[in-house]
């Protein structure tokens, strides 16, 4: 997948910012701050999107596994970290962490 601009949040057409996490390892229910490839943005918003295979960063700071679904997520996450790369292209958001990438397609 294509990596984008480091330290830039991926914004939807409505201006919302999403939080994404790669699925290269099993991080289910662990705190976001303990996960090296957590993709985190300093804002909160309501975003509707479909996810093929990924983890979601939710308000509680926990991660929940997901595998092909559509979901409305209200996210409040930690400040963006220096190792995150993300890019918003057309109707999808591609993000790259230290050990993998994930693409979210906006619904």
From Swiss-Prot:
Presence of keyword Electron transport: yes
Cofactor binding description: Binds 1 [2Fe-2S] cluster.
Gene Ontology terms for molecular function: 2 iron, 2 sulfur cluster binding; metal ion binding
Localization in the cell: Hydrogenosome
Originating organism: Psalteriomonas lanterna (Amoeboflagellate)
Propeptide span(s): 1-8
Required cofactor(s): [2Fe-2S] cluster
Residues that hold [2Fe-2S] cluster according to the record: 45, 51, 54
Main location: other
Protein name: Ferredoxin
A single GO cellular-component term on record: hydrogenosome
Function: Ferredoxins are iron-sulfur proteins that transfer electrons in a wide variety of metabolic reactions.
Keyword Cell membrane: no
Keyword list, A-Z: 2Fe-2S, Electron transport, Hydrogenosome, Iron, Iron-sulfur, Metal-binding, Transport
